[in-house]
């Protein structure tokens, strides 16, 4: 879920914090990508006749095809991707996970009815709702990335939190995910739609964390409280308080504790045993691996290894796999030039440097004039 309604709220309150961009504008950038979100996209998008792609044994291969070709597209655009995988979810997320399980059960029942009725549109819709990224999907993706020479990070907990930590440490430029809580975790830049297929023709949406805080007039701590009021993965919001009202309350009272003192409890229903303080702590001090201990390196692809991985039981076309491996190698060699702004830095002039230079120039001119004047003796004027 991320943060309920945050994207629209930012667009309404501070549209200057969002800009649309083309994927090619991130040439030379290192980007931390929410791997689970990507795998989910690939599982629901890479389909043949309404079903996921599988091998002869019925094992799903959609996620691998998506990961392979979408990563190549990123590399071809000069982006250096770092995939970040989820670890164990925090206990506070159990409520949200239970809701997701319940929604899948409802989708399963709806799918059965749609199948009986022969309603293909509904069958496809509910099939998508049943998609879940498994541990096996993640492990296969890690094996593939290793063969492609692309680094990945296993987060101890939430992938978005780890991505944000990498951004804050300067290890990467941005977080790429569809979940808005990357901003709540403090990612300086959030990129949405970066891993969407080219066929969808959707521009990359770039969110600036600094501009979001400035636009809302909130500190990072206050912004976290706003996100909790909106509703997050760790706890529900307060019934009756929508995005606009939540923003007004935060601007007036600055924290949830004061809001709870001031609001009319008869008008607004506060959840029983509301664990907003736990949610706040998870955003302020998330469990992440120390970015300084993570070495992010991109290697040459293992072409033969990729062929063995794809062309055995998974039955991919060998020529296409080898072609993909060669594209990765070509991208790696072209990326060595990097971005121009990584080579040149603007160094501010020391105080007083410019006036001194002008004074020196003036003195030099005077000296030259003196010398010239001395040399004109005995010369015929022109």
Curated annotation (Swiss-Prot):
Q: Which Enzyme Commission number(s) are listed? A: 3.1.-.-
| Primary localisation category | nucleus
Q: One biological-process term from Gene Ontology?
A: DNA replication, removal of RNA primer
PROSITE patterns in UniProt:
XPG_1, XPG_2
Q: Which InterPro entries match?
A: 5-3_exonuclease (IPR002421), 5-3_exonuclease_C_sf (IPR036279), Flap_endonuc (IPR023426), HhH2 (IPR008918), PIN-like_dom_sf (IPR029060), XPG-I_dom (IPR006086), XPG/Rad2 (IPR006084), XPG_CS (IPR019974)
Q: How does it assemble?
A: Interacts with PCNA. Three molecules of FEN1 bind to one PCNA trimer with each molecule binding to one PCNA monomer. PCNA stimulates the nuclease activity without altering cleavage specificity.
Similarity section: Belongs to the XPG/RAD2 endonuclease family. FEN1 subfamily.
Q: What is this protein called?
A: Flap endonuclease 1
